Amino acid sequence: MDYDDEAPELTLRLESFKDCWAEGAELVRAEVKEVEPNGRQFNPDVQSILTNEALGIFKILVARKNGEMIGYLTWMIDFDLEAYGTLIANQTAWYLKPGHYGVADKMFDFAMAHFKQVGVKYVYWHHTFNGRGKTLGRYFQRKGAKPISMNYMIQP
């Protein structure tokens, strides 16, 4: 499933991580800098990502304008261990270069259509408390999501 906007310069596609990583690493660095005030370092586990992608678990949706990568949305598809036979998706990373208004909404809609197509029953979206994504909770609610939990991070 691909999305080509009425304006042909915007494309949304599921891409292979290995095919977009060299270009995407710059965006991931920008995302980490924007949303990680706790000192979490940029050091992706590329081999685990590739393994999960080969298993059909990890997916990356890439937004491009005139061929240039401007954003990505990633998720992991899995089974709900507490509800037999229930396929779920957990959003992992989502980043869009500043100034590309409306593209994030198109990315969300693309992902939701994909989830429906592959039989996902529940999607777990999240947002950080830092950076531009800190207001995504209201956006998710406008799209029909309900807040169900809050995550906490601690170093042992």
Task: Label each PLM-derived region with a short phrase.
Residues 106-122:
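Conserved acyl-CoA
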Residues 1-43:
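Short amphipathic alpha-helix that is part of the acyltransferase structural core
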Residues 126-127, 146-156:
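Conserved catalytic-core motifs of GNAT/GCN5-like acyltransferases
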Residues 79-91, 146-148:
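A conserved beta-turn-beta hairpin within the catalytic core of GNAT-like acetyltransferases
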Residues 123-135:
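Conserved beta-strand-loop-alpha-helix junction that forms the acyl-donor binding cleft
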Residues 67-72, 89:
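Glycine-rich phosphate/pyrophosphate-binding loop shared by adenosine-nucleotide-utilizing enzymes
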Residues 90-102:
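A short, internal acetyl-CoA/4′-phosphopantetheine-binding micro-motif in the GNAT/acyltransferase core
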Residues 37-60, 65, 73-84:
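A conserved beta-strand-loop-helix scaffold within acyl/acetyltransferase catalytic domains
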